[in-house]
From Swiss-Prot:
Organism of this sequence: Campylobacter jejuni subsp. jejuni serotype O:6 (strain 81116 / NCTC 11828)
Entry function: Catalyzes the synthesis of the hydroxymethylpyrimidine phosphate (HMP-P) moiety of thiamine from aminoimidazole ribotide (AIR) in a radical S-adenosyl-L-methionine (SAM)-dependent reaction.
Cofactor comment text: Binds 1 [4Fe-4S] cluster per subunit. The cluster is coordinated with 3 cysteines and an exchangeable S-adenosyl-L-methionine.
Superkingdom assignment: Bacteria
Metabolic or biological pathway, per its Swiss-Prot or TrEMBL entry: Cofactor biosynthesis; thiamine diphosphate biosynthesis
Keyword Transmembrane helix part of the UniProt annotation: no
Protein's recorded name: Phosphomethylpyrimidine synthase
Positions contributing to [4Fe-4S] cluster binding: 406, 409, 413
Primary gene name: thiC
């Protein structure tokens, strides 16, 4: 089976590439060149028939991913499907099913069947439930069986923590971290490696993993098991050593035509974000960077969507290609529907803010909003807002008598004052 990368290397412009070119207003040659060298990916499993393809990477708009899925404390698949509907409503490009309890295949199959967004999973989360074995009883190649099952089901990308090999684990042991390993999948693999005194199975059998990805054109999202879970731990030796391992694994994947993106931090002080984005691009030769925030402070519990949006905007402006959303429930509980909505909007704002910095053409919508505000065209403002539904609701909650203003300024509305005086009309505030 040929992947999007293989086709690009041969100069074949696939239907998925055509769709992305139209969405992003990019030339055929630009896309082919950058997909062929790994700087742009189009995650598109051959079995995901409902997919509306999107590209991730150099010269493209920053994409947003929404996490959802059940846990052993909250098993309500109907609520998770409502989260999917909400993600579709906001035109989210990627959805990850992070279910980590029970038999997850039925929900995943339904997700692939109905979702136009690219679907991602973390197969190691599913290992115990799928294999019906406790962690210590799982064999190295058993993990590949889970990967194969996910790939065959139609998921477009998978988080695989192949970089936490014995070398990276040794460096981690010497680190003086406050929060150790905060990656759920990374902690499971590290525990397995320690209990079995064995190499990371995804690293040991990486070539077999690539064969599975090739068969279904699954994009590898190389997970950062050693990402910092606190600002104290950011940019330490453990994080960077794993990134170096991921850079080597990226080249091995590219050599056979498997598409790759790199996952990144995490928690990180705002002044460290730009250099971390540059470091990933340098080490991984421009591979798309998918960051989890980053959260710029550790004390925002209940408001971590704000911390994540601040970091995400800086990351996107500095080269990050996809942002994983963060909700107000982060670090506290499984998010509900309102949490998901708040997380989506905050992250879309961050992504767009970053795009304004790196893609000048993305300012057009903001300019239209500014014109609508000057013209006091409320319906146009609601239409242009990222969450126009909330904007309209808030306006109507204290709807003014005079629609040439809002209830904040009334007759002292600066826009209305200037519109009148510049037309030569008298301004009355009485």
């Amino acid at each position: 089976m040929k992947t999007q990368m293989n086709y690009a290397k041969e100069g074949v412009f696939t239907k998925e590439m055509q769709i992305v070119a139209q969405k992003e207003n990019l030339s055929k040659d630009f896309l082919l060149e950058n997909i062929a060298c790994g700087k742009i990916i189009i995650p598109a499993n051959i079995n995901h028939k409902s997919l509306d393809p999107n590209g991730i990477g150099f010269g493209l708009r920053t994409k947003v991913n929404v996490n959802l899925g059940v846990s052993n404390d909250c098993v309500d698949y109907s609520e998770e499907m409502k989260k999917v509907e909400l993600a579709h409503k906001f035109d989210i490009e990627a959805i990850m099913d992070l279910s980590n309890y029970g038999k997850t295949s039925r929900f995943r199959d339904e997700l692939v069947n109905v979702s136009k967004a690219m679907i991602g999973t973390v197969p190691v989360y599913d290992a115990v439930g799928f294999l019906e074995k406790d962690l210590k009883q799982i064999g190295a190649k058993d993990f590949l069986d889970v990967v194969y099952h996910h790939a065959k089901s139609g998921v477009d990308f998978m988080t695989i923590h192949a970089g936490i090999n014995s070398r990276a684990a040794h460096i981690f042991k010497q680190s003086k971290r406050l929060t150790n390993i905060v990656s759920r999948g990374g902690s499971v693999l590290y525990a397995w490696m320690m209990m079995k005194d064995a190499e990371n199975p995804f690293f040991e059998y990486y070539d077999d993993l690539l064969d599975i990805c090739l068969k279904y054109d699954v994009t590898l999202s190389l997970g950062d098991a050693l990402r910092p879970g606190s600002t104290h731990d950011a940019s330490d030796g453990a994080q960077i050593s794993e990134l170096i391992e991921l850079s080597l694994l990226t080249q091995r994947a590219w050599d056979v035509g498997v598409q790759v993106m790199i996952e990144g931090p995490g928690h990180m002080a705002i002044n460290e974000i730009e250099v971390n984005m540059q470091l990933e691009k340098r080490l991984c030769k421009g591979a798309p960077f998918y960051v989890l925030g980053p959260l710029v402070t550790d004390i925002g519990a209940g408001y971590d969507h704000i911390s994540g949006a601040i970091g995400g905007a800086v990351a996107a402006a500095s080269g990050a290609d996809m942002l994983c959303y963060v909700t107000p429930a982060e670090h506290l509980r499984l998010p509900n529907l309102e949490d998901v909505r708040e997380g989506i909007v905050a992250t879309k704002i961050a992504a767009h803010a970053g795009d304004i910095a790196k893609l000048p053409k993305e300012r057009a919508r903001d300019d239209e909003m500014s014109k609508a505000r000057q013209e006091i065209d409320w319906e146009k403002m609601f239409k242009l807002a990222i969450d126009g539904e909330k904007a309209k609701k808030m306006f109507n909650e204290r709807r003014p008598d005079d629609l040439n203003s809002c209830s904040m300024c009334g007759k002292m509305c600066a826009m209305n004052t200037m519109n009148q005086i510049l037309k030569g009309e008298d301004v009355s505030l009485a």
